[in-house]
Each structure stands twice: as C-alpha cells, then as structure tokens.
Amino acid sequence: MAKRHKHFEGRGRGGSRGRGRGRGGSRGRGRGGSRSRGAGRGGFGRSSNDDNWRNSSIPFGDGDLGNFNFADIDVPRGRRVYYSPDDIEDYYFGKSENMESMKMGGLRPGHKREDTPRSSSFRARPVQFIKAKDVYDPSHDLIIKLRSKNLEQESQDEELSQGDAESAREDFESGTEEEIEEEEEVLPEIEREEVEEEEVEPEEVEEEEVEPEEVDSEDAESEEVDDKDLFFIDEEGYNEDTLPTVPSVSISEDSTVKKPQKTNLEFNDILTVGKVEINLAHDASDDGVFVSNVKKNYHPFSGYISQVMKNIQVSDEDDDEDDYEDEEEDFQSDFSYKYEQQTTSKAISADIEKLSISSENLKNSSDISRDNSPDNNEEQESKDPEFGFLEEDFVINTSEVSVTNIRIGFSENSYFLKCYRLFGHYESKWIDQETFLDLILNDLGLPEHRLNAYLTFIRDSLIPKEEPPEPTYSDIHFSDTSEEESDNDSEIGDDMREGIEDLISYATKLEKDRNFEFETKSLQTVGKGKKKKLLVQEDMQLDGVIASELQDKFSTRLDNKAKKRRTKEDFIDQENEKSDDLFKKYPYGLHVLNIKEEFELFIRRSDKEALVFPPLDPHGNKTITKFAKFYFMKTNKRGRGNQTHIFVQKVKATRYNEPNYNIIDNLTRQRPIFMRHDVSKPRNEYQRTERVKLPKGKFHVKEGEVVGQDAPVIDRNNIGRILLERLGWSEGEGLGIQGNKGISEPVFAVVKKSKTGLRHERKKRIE
C-alpha cells in the first residue's frame, strides 16, 4: 500500500492541519485532529481543547454558573452542560489581558462598560441587604442563663453574710449580759474591781477585732430593764473552788468578705528622707504601704537605711482617738466587714509628719552607718601588714630590682628600674606594669597576695606623703613693748657685739661668689665605637697637654668597659665549636645572638628536624619560645626542675613563611645573657686569693717630729697644679683672690709624747 503523506490526514472538519474536507478524525475522518487550527467547520483553533470542552466530567463552577454566557467563549455548543474549568480559568486568569477578564479587574476603574448593550459585559446590579426574620445567635441564650445564675448566687451570699452578722451580734449581746449576772452573783463588791481588771485584756483584744454596733436611742428606750433585775445583794459570798470561769466571746472570721477601700490619693513608690531615697510598695488588698525588700545591696548605705526604717515608730498620741472613731463608724455602717490589724514592723503612716525616731535607735543606726561606711572598708583593707613585716616578703631578693621613678597613669603605671636579671646590664629603663608584675611574680617568685603590699611600698618610697604645714601663729598677736626690747638687750653682752661689723662687711663682699652655681653637663663625644673621642671645645681654653691627658683617660675608660662587656664568642667552647650538641657547644650559658644564630643555622639545614637547647631559667626558656614562634616553629618543654629545656621542631608553616625579623631584632635588644641552670662554673677558673697574715710593724714617732715633714711635693705634671698655675697661682703664694688669700705657709703639727694633757695632770695630782 502506498504511503500516505501528512497532508492527507485530518480531512473534513478541523483536520490535523485544518486542510481536510471530511468530518475530521485523527486521520481525516473525525471531527478534528490533535493539531487542527480551525480551517474546518466550526474549528476553535485547538482540537484538544475542543475535546476537553465536550468530554469533561466536571460540572462548570459546581453548578453555580449554570446560566453561563457562551458569547464570551467561542466554542461549539453541544447538548451537554459540562465544561472544562481549566479553560475557564485560562480565559479569566490566563495570559489574555482583555478588559472583560478578571485579571484586569483591579486595573479598570468602576464599571467601564455599564452602558454597553453587550451581554458579555460585567453586571451593574447593586448589592441589596435584606434583614433576616430570625436571629441566629446560639450564645445569646447561654449568656442570659449564666447572668441569672450569677445573680442568684450573689443574693444567696448576701443573705448568708447578713444572717451571720445578726447572729454574731445577738450572741455578743447575750454573752455580755450573762457575764455581768454571773460576776455579780459570785464576786463580792470588794474584789470585783480586781477581777474586772484581769478580765479587761481579753475583752479589749476581742473588741479590737469586732466592735458591737451602737443601739439607737429608740431601741434603748424600748428595752429598758428594772433595777431589781440588774442589781442584787450577795449575802453568801464565794469560795475560790466554786469561782466560775468567765466565757469569752469569739466570732469566726470570714476571709472571703472584704470591704472595698477606695482612695483618691496617688501612690508614689519613692520616699525621700533628706538625701536618702526609700523604695515603697503598695498592698492593694489592705491598702497598706510597706518598704520593699531589695535583695541586692546596690548602695553602700543600704544596711544603715534598713536599720533606720526598722526603728521608725508611729506616734500614737493623736492617732488613737481618730482611729477609734473611724473604726466605730465603719462598724456601724456595715458589720459584715472587719478590719485586719496592720503589721507594725514595716507599716508606714500616711502622715509623714507623725513619724518619730527614738534617740537610742538613732545611736544604734549611727553605729551601723559607721561600720558600713566606705572609709571603714578602706581601713580594714589597710590593716594588712606592710611589706617587710612577714616572712613571705623575704622570699625574693629586692636588691635585684631598683625602682627609681614611677609614672602614674589612668589604667596602669610605668616603672623606671634597674635590673641586671631582666636587661642584662645596669642601666635603668622604663617598663610597663604588665612586664614589671611578670618579673616580680614569675621570675623573682613573690607570693601573689603580697603583690599589692609591695607596690604600695614602692609608691610610698618614691612619692612622699603630704605632711600638714607647720603653724605660723599668724593669728596670735605679739606685743612690741619696750620691756621686751630691754630684756633682749640685756641678754646680748658687749663682748658678743665685737667684730659684728667686720663679719657683715666680709659676708656682703663674698655674697656673689657664695651663691654661684655651676652647670653640670655630660661629656660630649664625637664618633662611634673605637673612634669615639672626647669633644674639647675652644671655650674651655685648655692647653694641648691637658687635652691629650683627658683624651687618654677617656679612652682608658672605654677600654675598661669593653673588657667587662661579654660577647657571643665568649660562651662558645673552642673544642666543640662546630658540634650540633648545644649542651657541649655552650657549657655555661648563651648570648642572645647565639640563640638567633642557632635558629638561622637550623632553618637553613634541611636534614635537621629538631633542635634542643640547654636548660635555662624560666625567662630564658620563654625567650627561646618567642624566637621559635616568629621563626614559625613548634616548641615543647622537656625535663623537670633545673633540667627543664626547650625542644624545637620544624612544621609545615616553617617552609612557606619567612621569619619576622622585625620582632626578632627587638628580642636581641633585650636581655643579652642567659646562663645555664643545670651547670655551675668550675672553681678552678676563679682566681682564689689567700689572706696571708703578716706581722704588723709598730708605727714609731719621735718627740718633736713635725707631722708630714717627709711628704713629697706635688709634681708639676699634676692636672690640679697645672690648672692652678693657669689661673695665676705661683709656688709660695696662698690660695684665693686678691685681698682674701689664704695662708702661705702650712700649719705645722709637732709630735708631743712626754705629756698627755689632762690625763697627765691628773696622774700628777694623785702622786
């Protein structure tokens, strides 16, 4: 059979491509193929949608839109009333933006096509609201029932409360009458007053709780009783065994019934007494005011305030009668309500003017305030013994640290100190407080609880305490009378006045030279290192010989300093100079440059993975750890006690990071020398000197010998003599300026052995 082409498919109405003439199936026989474009009779454009319209089993709009206007949707109308909701949704909410679609409903204002005769336009019918005949409210009946039930319950409670009050009042009145009759029958008139005083206390207590209602005047007149029924004569007396006990009347309290109390006053929760603020609280149940307990003592005077508030007492001089009248009025108005006794421990009267504080309590509160004052706390802290009074203070050697100055800052202080153990030299430097505390606690080993005492000791030694100025007695008047002058003149004799004028003239003559001050300057030098020389200025006008001698002395001074200074070569053992074992290479200690050199050699060698340093003191081990940190290496501590040493290892970061030479150079400028902790120097290296006792020759002097007669004359090469000769002095002259020269010849002292002064005369008298 010959192959049929695509253009033969879908003949008829709505073929696959809309070209067929037949009824239109999938192959040209049905009513429209799947890809029909509406060329046939009544084609909609999409044959699949056409099938959905006709074959859908879902009623359109659940039957609510049965009278749907088909003019809006151009589809073939069949005999069935089922339409596809998907196409309806696509029409109204799809991509189409027709003015009649619901998608554009929010964009068009009002009923735009109200006047158009088209049936496809939206309706313009107004909305009508019709009142229903019956109100459907199921909760309405329940609310009415509950309201009636609550009213019945309230009425029952009121009847019960009124009945209890009336019964209590009747019991109270009957009880009082029976007590009076029993007392009159049993007790004689003589002892009746004593018994009444004893029985007053429980009655008064009960009257405070519940007071009887006063009887109106009309009721009192109607209930008058004859005197015979009230009074009688007791002729028999009574015995103590037959004395009846007087019954007491008590009324049960109803805690549920409370009288509502209203007030028009505003409550302020802070009470200010002088400069003290007190927190108050209000109890809505009994309308009382009390001091709120603060759990945290946020104020240094909180203990004092609480003690004062405990001692506050309410003065009862004027309030007793007023309170009694108020309670009586309230009892008459409504007997069912009763008053709860206010607590006197924390209650505060509404009238602040009536508060009183007893003098004894005020003294106690002042003592408490003195104990809680911050000055007293400082005194208790200062009771710790000063530095130097405990054995723990002598654990460290304070002579190793010499603090000569202190800079007091806002957060921390700086110290200007001299410490060979820290710096490696005897020059003073400024260090911060953290470094100073690390030196005192870790290196020197001072106990931590004595640190404040040590810092206070240093501060007091450098900063003198301010002493009160001496009184000048400027407010005391001294009289200048002739009697005082005569007394002073009598004390000074004529012998004392001799030569005063000469002394005054001599003092005024030398006044300029006496107060002359010389400036002190450090030596000025030129050059560095071995070429360093003393700078001699032309203003000094020194001779060449003197200048050369000064230069020689300055160079000698530098050489002596250089000899004392130790270099890194001094610590290396010559026999083990190239050894990898640092224990043998540095037998006694290391220089800080030796540590840097060992790290440089270690980082260059790829075959060496570990480096072991000899044991040093804690600060030395910490310095090695710092070097390893900035060389990007790992360190571990090994050993115990004086055998503690540092073990250094390379890590992956060592290869890919360059050392931080800026910080490493700063470390080399700090402490220079680190001695080993586990080894001491051999004794044969010390030059031991032995003391040899030689017989001392007695110094003999002769009678009449001049002291210092054989002393040599000062040489002409002496610097002091050269300076004097430059100033104009010559041999045989006295020292000094013209007109005030000293003696030209020295005073001679002659040895005298034959006589011994007063002792000789005393022996002579005894003989």
UniProtKB/Swiss-Prot annotation:
Residues 1-71, 101-127, 147-258, 363-387, 466-494 are annotated as: Disordered. Signal peptide: none annotated. It comes from the Eukaryota. One of its GO terms (cellular component) is preribosome, small subunit precursor. Residues 589-652 form the R3H domain. Residues 716-763 form the G-patch domain. Keywords: Cytoplasm, mRNA processing, mRNA splicing, Nucleus. Residues 245-254 have a biased composition (Polar residues). Residues 173-239, 481-493 have a biased composition (Acidic residues). Belongs to the SQS1 family. This is Protein SQS1. It comes from Vanderwaltozyma polyspora (strain ATCC 22028 / DSM 70294 / BCRC 21397 / CBS 2163 / NBRC 10782 / NRRL Y-8283 / UCD 57-17).
